[in-house]
């Protein structure tokens, strides 16, 4: 906690991740799925390692997910080949798992950790297989500086020059953008994932979300990983997103409750190419529902649902969750998992991993 992104990654996260294995990732994924179900999330997009183990956790829990192997090569040709090979393995093994609830995307980490050649191969694979691309872009000022020094352009401009951008790209963060990049993103149909808590905790900055939405871009909402948040509560994330935009713009009207609620629901579905299936309650869509107990003191009187959900509620108010028509939690009790077992498994995995660091 309480570190700059570069220090956090280089000195803590990446060294610890060198000791990861599939069992650790499975335990962590199960724990994350429990937390998401209990706070009302039915669908998530995640980039990490050992993603076949993550897919298995998704299958067992009943959630829906878009997963991708996180690729980093730092201009190392052998590493690039290994990353592409692993991504292809995950595509073959996991795409369409769990009756279609698991889909695979491609996950190049970022423009500053991936070579141009890797990014170009990712674009070719996405075109060949019809897959989405999940990437982190313009998260910090230092990232923008590194990309400009190496390639002579800002991150999104560089990605466009190599033919990377498109409607199938989901770019996380997008904190440090120029006006020309915003116009570029709109013209290319790039989807964005706003992660306000993570960006503020790491002091990366505050994305110009109000301007992005007013420009017509599809901006969804995310928590980022639990290591930089430190929870996966999307209801809490809505409030933080709204309040951070109000202070950034010095305007109480910036990012109203209705808009931020759409970011957490239909915009997320649209970003993942699922707007015709989920994201709203409509006839012929999949039954993805989260039921909230409105008879709580902090939610009374119940007059403005969007306002209450964004500014007053929390994930703890969710009582029942349904994904793809299956009840995953009812009256606060998980149906698909033994919560005590998952917590014990994750705690044991964490202790074992830390002992190796």
What kind of feature is each model-predicted range?
Residues 1-62, 86-97, 347-355:
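Alpha-helical scaffold segments that flank or form the walls of functional sites
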Residues 1-26, 61-76, 81-84, 141-168, ...:
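Active-site gating loops and adjacent loop-to-helix segments of metal-dependent hydrolytic enzymes
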Residues 39-41, 63, 130, 189-190:
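A structural motif
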Residues 40, 58, 106, 136, ...:
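Divalent metal-coordination and catalytic microenvironments
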Residues 53-176, 180:
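Metal-coordinating catalytic core of metallo-dependent amide/deamination hydrolases
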Residues 161-168, 210-296, 312-313:
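His/Asp/Glu-enriched, well-ordered alpha-helical/loop segment
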Residues 201-203:
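Helical hairpin unit composed of two closely spaced alpha helices linked by a short loop
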Residues 262-357:
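Active-site microenvironment of metallo-dependent hydrolases
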